Amino acid sequence: MRFKNLNPLEQHTARLLLWSALFNGVMISLNQTQDIIARKALHAEVWQLTVMAMIWPVSNFLSIWWGRIFEKSQHKSRYFILVGVLGRLSLFYGLWLTGMNEFMLLMGLVFSFNSLQIPAQNTIWQRNIDSGKRGKIYGYTISLGVFVAVVFTFIAGRALDRNENLFRLILTITAVCGFIAAFLLSLIRIKEKPDEPIHPKLSLKETLTDPIKRTLTLLKKNKPFAAFERSFSIYGMGFIMVQPVLPIFLVDMLKLSYTGNFIAKGIISQIPMLFLSPYLGKWHDKLHPFRFICVFFGLLALFPALIVCSALTLKWHLLSVTLAYVAFAVFGVAMTGVNIAWNMGSIFFAGKEDASMYQGVHVTMTGIRGILAPLLGLLLLKTTGIISVFAVASCFLITASIISWRDYKRLHI
C-alpha cells in the first residue's frame, strides 16, 4: 500500500491498523472455525450450537453502553488495553478447557469485549482517515488480516486432523495474537474534535439509561440510518439463523474432516475477502450504502440456496461437496461487501457526529436479531428439517436486498 497520498496522522494510523490487522487475522480464523471445533472436538449438542450462535450477537447488546463510555472518555487508548487483557488473553484458559459449556462461557467473554472494540475502532476510522481514503485503507487491512487467517486456518486444520486436542494450543496462540492486535490499536493517537466538550460524569442510573434513550432518539431523528438498520436486521435474520445448523450440515451430513471443514469455512470463504476487499472498499466510498448492500444481500441469498442443492445431492458425495464449496465461495464474495458495509456504513450516516455511538447502536441491533434468529433456525430444524432453514434464510436475504433498493429510490439519493 502507498502512503504518499496520506497526511502524517493518516500514515501513523494506517501503519498501526495494518500491523494490528496482521495479528488480528488469527482472531478471524477462530471466528470462522469455532463452531467446527465445538461440534467435532467438544461434541456440542444442537442446543449448545444454538446458544453458541447467539453468543456473538447477544453480547453485542453491550455495544451502546461501551460506545457511550468510549465517546465520553478522555483516555480512549485504555479501552483497547482492556479488550486485549480481558477479551483476548482470557483465551489462555483454553489450556485447561474440558467441556463445551466452558467453551461457550469463554467465547462469551471474548465477544463481550469485542463489542467494545468495534465502536472504538470506528472512531479511529472516522477521525483519523479522510472519508475518500477510508474504504480503500479498510480494504487493505481486511485483506492482510484474511491472508493471515487463511494460512493459520489451513495449518490449524491439518494439525487438528493429526491431534484433535491441539485446539487448546490454537486457543493459546489466538490469545497472544489477539492481545497484540488490541495493544497496537491502543498506540494510535485519536484526533480530538476541536470543539469537543469535556463530558460531565454521569450517575450510575444515567450511565445505564442514557445510551438506551439516545439510541431511540437517534433512530427516530435519523430516518435513513433507521432504514439502514432495518435492512441489516432482515439480512441478519437470514445470516444468523443458519449458523447453528451449518456445523451439523458440514460435520454430520457431509462428514468433512477438520481440514475439509476449515477449507470451506476458513479458506474458500475468506479468499474473496483477501483479493476483493481493497476494490470493494473503494467502490463503497463511491456508492451510497443502500445501493451497496442491495447488491451484496442479493448475492448472499445464493449461499443458502446452493447449500440446499448440496443437501439434495448427498448420495453423490463429490457433487455435494463441490456444491458446498461453491456456496462458500459465493458466501465469501458476498460477505466481503457486507462486512465493509457493516463496519463502514454507520460512519456515513453519522456525518459529523461521533461514529462510535452510531456503530454502538448498529452492533447492538445485532443482539436483538441474535436472540430470535438462532431460535427460529432451531425451530425449523426440529419441525421441518435442515433444508427448510436454508430456504427460509435465502428468502430473508432476498427481502433485505429488495427493501434496500426501495429505500435507495424512496430517499431520492
Tell me what each language-model feature is.
Residues 22, 101-117, 318-337:
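Hydrophobic core of transmembrane alpha-helices in multi-pass small-molecule transporters
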Residues 1-11, 192-230:
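Juxtamembrane intracellular "pre-TM" segments in multi-pass secondary transporters
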Residues 84-99, 298-317:
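C-terminal ends and interior cores of transmembrane alpha-helices
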Residues 62-75, 160, 275-289, 381:
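Helix-to-loop junctions at the C-terminal end of transmembrane segments
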Residues 1-70, 224-265:
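Helix-loop boundary and gating motifs at the non-cytosolic
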Residues 116-129, 336-351:
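Intracellular juxtamembrane helix-capping segments at the cytosolic ends
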Residues 33-41, 68, 72, 95, ...:
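Transmembrane alpha-helix termini and helix-breaking/packing motifs in multi-pass membrane transporters
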Residues 71-84, 285-300:
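Cytoplasmic membrane-interface "Motif A"-like loop-to-helix N-cap segments
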